[in-house]
């Protein structure tokens, strides 16, 4: 049906209008709360209650964040952490409620988090989190591999000593019988085998203790570094916010590059909207979401540096996983080492013959008479790992810490893109707290735009040939670029006193009659300009200007200091 598309479009427009109206209605209480918060002195009891409620909420939130930061992240004891958080909350409430610049400073610290100082804080916290999680884990896995080496060494030494002991026992079991005949069995075991075993045990134990101490030292160093760096960056955050507020209040040129609504209204009232046609490149639209080319280029460069940090984080995480896999493979190999059973059987038979040569003469075997028969069996196990040496399991990498570090780095990367908006928000916050200062800054920006427009207009004037029509009159009029407002400075002087205000001289000696002055470039001079602020109403001011258009000299002389007649 033909009516359906129009009805659907009308329905969409109505829905969009309703959503937009509802959105602004929802923002109205927030705007009222912000107006009350940014007022130096509340105008009503409602604003006072709103201001106190906001200050109390911010103080409670600050106390909770401080406690979580101290107790959970920096691992301080709960008791001192709660005490410090309570004191911080009380100080924040009193400062916000009684000192308006502190409220502005507190509000400025929020967009400052989205700038370079906040990015440093996020990156330092990310690095510390990654170091606390990865470095001890890598050292623990190296320690597990070292424990495998210790257990294998200890087990091999035990097996060697046990084998030596069994062989020594077998040689002793033979006793004096081993000395029968001309041959004997001699087996000698050194008595310092236990000392060697203890020495190797101490060496391996020392290596493991060194690894354990290194792991504890790395954990403590990372935690201490995180505490110090976080504290320094938080202090730097407050200092940077205070520096911005100081420069905003003392320097009219500082961060005064935004085309705000106040500037637009002032230009409209002064009928000077042409000053923004076209706007200068350095002037940023405060309410516009589009970034300038300079801002985009700066964002790309900083994102490149953050990409290098992400690569370093990925390398650290990969190192952690490789160390875990190697330690796990080593521990599994040690656990699967077989136990080798060894059985030593000693069989010793002694027999004798009497007149054995007689049967030998008849090519017969001599009968043997058994004299001694010894049968001994010795069994033990050859273990490559010691039963008294427990194997340490490989420590699996924690996924939460690298993910948190990566999230913080991505958040820091987002602050690169949001830094331009954070600067605009910071300017808007300071302007809402100090409206009189913002009005002075708007007037200064208006004057700057006016000067830029005047320079631009002066550069656009043509510099062609002067058009002079010779006329035989003895005097010449003032140049056209002298503003008509200088007529008020002219004075009728008495005869013989002073000089004529305007005089023209033809110094080229070849043009015949004196032409009128020809000016191709100039500007109007106003008494409101800074170079004329020293003049008083009781003085006559004349201008002495020399201009040379193509060797034709026009000279205008001026006198000052003559009293006004009457």
UniProtKB/Swiss-Prot annotation:
Pfam families: DC_STAMP. Residues 73-81, 150-227, 326-398 are extracellular. It is found in: Membrane. It comes from the Eukaryota. InterPro entries: CSR-E3_Ligase_Protein, DC_STAMP-like. Signal peptide: none annotated. GO terms for biological process: cellular response to estrogen stimulus; cellular response to tumor necrosis factor; multinuclear osteoclast differentiation; positive regulation of macrophage fusion; positive regulation of osteoclast differentiation; positive regulation of osteoclast proliferation. It is a multi-pass membrane protein. GO terms for cellular component: membrane. Keywords: Differentiation, Membrane, Transmembrane, Transmembrane helix. Disulfide bonds: none annotated. The chain crosses the membrane at residues 52-72, 82-102, 129-149, 228-248, 305-325, 399-419. Residues 1-51, 103-128, 249-304, 420-566 are cytoplasmic. Probable cell surface receptor that plays a role in cellular fusion and cell differentiation. Cooperates with DCSTAMP in modulating cell-cell fusion in both osteoclasts and foreign body giant cells (FBGCs). Involved in osteoclast bone resorption. Promotes osteoclast differentiation and may play a role in the multinucleated osteoclast maturation. This is Osteoclast stimulatory transmembrane protein. It comes from Homo sapiens.
């Amino acid at each position: 049906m033909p009516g359906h598309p129009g009805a659907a479009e009308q329905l969409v427009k109505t829905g969009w209008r309703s959503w937009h109206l509802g959105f602004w209605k929802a923002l109205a209480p927030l705007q009222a709360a912000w107006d009350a918060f940014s007022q130096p002195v509340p105008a009503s009891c409602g604003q006072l209650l709103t201001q106190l409620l906001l200050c109390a909420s911010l103080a409670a939130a600050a106390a909770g964040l401080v406690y979580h930061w101290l107790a959970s992240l920096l691992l301080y004891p709960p008791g001192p952490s709660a005490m410090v958080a309570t004191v911080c909350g009380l100080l924040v409430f009193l400062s916000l409620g009684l000192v308006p610049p502190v409220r502005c400073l507190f509000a400025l610290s929020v967009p400052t988090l989205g700038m370079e100082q906040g990015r440093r804080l996020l990156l330092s916290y990310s690095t510390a989190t990654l170091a606390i999680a990865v470095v001890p884990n890598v050292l623990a896995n190296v320690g597990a591999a070292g424990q495998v080496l210790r257990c294998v060494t200890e087990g091999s030494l035990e097996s060697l000593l046990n084998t030596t002991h069994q062989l020594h026992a077998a040689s002793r079991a033979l006793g004096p019988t081993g000395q029968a005949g001309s041959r004997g069995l001699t087996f000698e075991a050194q008595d310092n085998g236990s000392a060697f075993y203890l020495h190797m045990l101490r060496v391996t134990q020392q290596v493991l203790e060194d690894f354990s101490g290194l792991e504890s030292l790395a954990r403590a160093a990372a935690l201490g570094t995180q505490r110090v760096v976080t504290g320094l960056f938080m202090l730097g955050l407050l200092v940077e916010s205070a520096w911005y507020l100081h420069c905003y209040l003392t320097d009219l040129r500082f961060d005064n590059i935004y085309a705000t609504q106040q500037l637009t209204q002032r230009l409209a009232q002064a009928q000077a909207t042409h000053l923004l046609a076209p706007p200068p490149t350095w002037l940023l639209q405060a309410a516009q979401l589009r970034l300038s080319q300079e801002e985009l280029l700066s964002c790309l460069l900083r994102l490149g540096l953050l990409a290098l940090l992400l690569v370093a984080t990925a390398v650290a995480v990969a190192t952690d996983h490789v160390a875990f896999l190697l330690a796990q493979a080593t521990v599994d190999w040690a656990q699967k080492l077989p136990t080798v059973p060894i059985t030593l059987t000693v069989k010793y038979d002694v027999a004798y013959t009497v007149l054995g040569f007689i049967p030998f003469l008849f090519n017969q075997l001599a009968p043997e008479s058994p004299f001694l028969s010894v049968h001994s069996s010795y069994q033990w196990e050859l273990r490559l790992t010691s039963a008294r040496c427990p194997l340490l399991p490989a420590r699996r990498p924690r996924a939460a810490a690298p993910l948190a570090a990566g999230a913080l780095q991505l958040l820091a990367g987002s602050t690169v893109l949001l830094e331009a908006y954070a600067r605009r928000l910071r300017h808007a916050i300071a302007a809402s707290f100090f409206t009189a200062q913002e009005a002075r800054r708007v007037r200064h920006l208006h004057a700057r735009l006016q000067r830029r427009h005047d320079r631009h207009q002066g550069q656009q004037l043509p510099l062609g040939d002067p058009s002079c029509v010779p006329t035989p009159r003895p005097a010449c009029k003032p140049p056209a670029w002298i503003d008509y407002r200088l007529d008020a400075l002219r004075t009728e002087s008495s005869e013989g006193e002073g000089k004529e205000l305007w005089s023209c001289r033809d110094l080229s000696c070849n043009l015949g009659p004196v032409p009128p002055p020809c000016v191709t470039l100039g500007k109007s001079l106003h008494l409101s300009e800074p170079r004329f602020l020293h003049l008083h109403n009781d003085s006559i001011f004349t201008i002495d200007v020399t201009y040379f258009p193509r060797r034709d000299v026009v000279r205008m002389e001026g006198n000052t200091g003559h009293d006004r007649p009457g």
